[in-house]
Amino acid sequence: MHLDHAHTHDGPSAVSADAHRPDGTRRALRIGLGGPVGSGKTATVAALCRALRDAFSLAVVTNDIYTREDAEFLLREAVLPPERITAVETGACPHTAIRDDISANLEAVEDLEDEVGPLDLVLVESGGDNLTATFSKGLVDAQIFVIDVAGGDDIPRKGGPGVTTADLLVVNKTDLAPYVGSDLGRMAADAKAQRAELPVVFQSLRTEPGVAPVADWVRARLAAWAA
């Protein structure tokens, strides 16, 4: 699996904000999850929380335009204690709050570290956006981009910064492929052509192995962060 931190492009995997808090302690690793509306970002966040919460101290920041719907879903599912889940209401296009003006998200992350820290990991979920959505290097250290087979098997071929430069591309809802006519082999080939050595995971949260491959990728990131 590709875990090279020395990328030369200016995409999301370039070096981000200072790795230390003002008091000199090491801050949490921050991983952003972006992708189109309905691709399964929140369900993936929930599954990751369940997979990682026993081994790591983690928290979540969600983004919605005018509501707290994603955060409320995570709270209902009890994936983490309530104080470890917070919501940002962006009031504008989702990419604005994760790339152009990150102040609200950065404050939310820092408040979580102050209030429930020390934390190993903060997951920052973007509101649903298009294929161009990327996170600011000042907000997250790595980005996962989630698409789904119901959006069409041409999505990887269409590219866009989210697809081509995210540190991990997740093709979600693979169990639906036979019902929507999506060719997983074609999607895999197109993703490889767009992303070269950057990793791609095909995922169904309804069938084994579920979120396990993505959770393993996150664990590897955490190990590298702590090294």
From Swiss-Prot:
GO CC field: cytoplasm
Primary residence: cytoplasm
Stretches the record annotates as Disordered: 1-22
Subcellular location(s) per record: Cytoplasm
Basic and acidic residues biased stretches: 1-10
Taxonomy, superkingdom: Bacteria
GO function terms (MF aspect): GTP binding; GTPase activity; nickel cation binding
Gene Ontology terms describing biological process: urea catabolic process
Subunit structure: Homodimer. UreD, UreF and UreG form a complex that acts as a GTP-hydrolysis-dependent molecular chaperone, activating the urease apoprotein by helping to assemble the nickel containing metallocenter of UreC. The UreE protein probably delivers the nickel.
Function: Facilitates the functional incorporation of the urease nickel metallocenter. This process requires GTP hydrolysis, probably effectuated by UreG.
HAMAP family named among the record's database cross-references: UreG
Identification of the protein by name: Urease accessory protein UreG
Species assigned in the record: Streptomyces avermitilis (strain ATCC 31267 / DSM 46492 / JCM 5070 / NBRC 14893 / NCIMB 12804 / NRRL 8165 / MA-4680)
Name of encoding gene: ureG
